[in-house]
Curated annotation (Swiss-Prot):
<feature type="binding site">
    <location>
        <position position="127"/>
    </location>
    <ligand>
        <name>Fe cation</name>
    </ligand>
</feature>
<dbReference type="GO" id="GO:0005737">
    <property type="term" value="C:cytoplasm"/>
</dbReference>
<dbReference type="GO" id="GO:0002949">
    <property type="term" value="P:tRNA threonylcarbamoyladenosine modification"/>
</dbReference>
<keyword id="KW-0808">Transferase</keyword>
<comment type="similarity">
    <text>Belongs to the KAE1 / TsaD family.</text>
</comment>
<dbReference type="InterPro" id="IPR017860">
    <property type="entry name" value="Peptidase_M22_CS"/>
</dbReference>
<keyword id="KW-0819">tRNA processing</keyword>
<feature type="binding site">
    <location>
        <position position="111"/>
    </location>
    <ligand>
        <name>Fe cation</name>
    </ligand>
</feature>
<keyword id="KW-0408">Iron</keyword>
<dbReference type="GO" id="GO:0061711">
    <property type="term" value="F:N(6)-L-threonylcarbamoyladenine synthase activity"/>
</dbReference>
<dbReference type="GO" id="GO:0000408">
    <property type="term" value="C:EKC/KEOPS complex"/>
</dbReference>
<protein>
    <recommendedName>
        <fullName>tRNA N6-adenosine threonylcarbamoyltransferase</fullName>
        <ecNumber>2.3.1.234</ecNumber>
    </recommendedName>
</protein>
<dbReference type="GO" id="GO:0005506">
    <property type="term" value="F:iron ion binding"/>
</dbReference>
<feature type="binding site">
    <location>
        <position position="107"/>
    </location>
    <ligand>
        <name>Fe cation</name>
    </ligand>
</feature>
<feature type="binding site">
    <location>
        <begin position="127"/>
        <end position="131"/>
    </location>
    <ligand>
        <name>substrate</name>
    </ligand>
</feature>
<comment type="subunit">
    <text>Monomer. Component of the KEOPS complex that consists of Kae1, Bud32, Cgi121 and Pcc1; the whole complex dimerizes.</text>
</comment>
<feature type="binding site">
    <location>
        <position position="159"/>
    </location>
    <ligand>
        <name>substrate</name>
    </ligand>
</feature>
Amino acid sequence: MLALGIEGTAHTLGIGIVSEKKVLANVFDTLTTEKGGIHPKEAAEHHARLMKPLLKKALEKAGISMDDIDVIAFSQGPGLGPALRVVATAARALAIRYNKPIVGVNHCIAHVEITKMFGIKDPVGLYVSGGNTQVLALEGGRYRVFGETLDIGIGNAIDVFARELGLGFPGGPKLEKLAEKGKNYIDLPYAVKGMDLSFSGLLTEAIRKYRSGKFRVEDLAYSFQETAFAALVEVTERALAHTEKKEVVLVGGVAANNRLREMLKIMAEDRGVKFFVPPYDLCRDNGAMIAYTGLRMYKAGISFPLEKTIVKQKFRTDEVEITW
């Protein structure tokens, strides 16, 4: 059984084709801007322009045609409204033209679900990206959000700070390299509130200290990462303690950061739980995770009538009943 998935919640358009155990194609194109940030209209235009060539590329890579696809899945939300609507329109058009069932997928859930292709059973997930920062796990038939950012996503915080330092966009990899040269920890605000996190105070103070000219930029980069990542690891560990689950996964674009991986791995080893990070192309926003989650949903008897394929910009993770 094969599923085609279309991802387009933000600045990346991704199209993936998967079977139950294998990724046959996973292609994407990311809108980049000189100043950074994403304008929803520009993202929508980017997705509309590249939808057809990317679909062709995915089918060619998988060595199949649309006739071979069993179900079409698309990212229903959360995300940027105009971008989501382009994706949903394309998915509906394909479903109608080729007479295929269609499934809307929650983007955040898909990030965790794709780890199950690699034998992960029931993890606590730390999902870290530009716009999202969540600790989630399956409890009572739904993905419960145990902790999340109260203001900005960790990826956005990193990008804004990197931009302030003149590193350009995306800033994550460049900030990480700079942080590796840092030697002295500089005190920065650490904000964990219950199980939730806040990064705005950390970002504001890091920028203030940088502008003061009194601190080495390498030390500031190092301290920024250490402070933010320690908070992420703390709330993830609390969720593990609460749920008593034996697996923890790291997903989302910021999962590329080696220091965050290292800190989570140490915590997991201390607790005696399995730690897993998918290959990076399945960590970042991608169509394969949408296809895989959609396939699992479809196999459990879920498909959407067209009138239920409306996009949800603020699609909460715990809205979805997990029956697959």
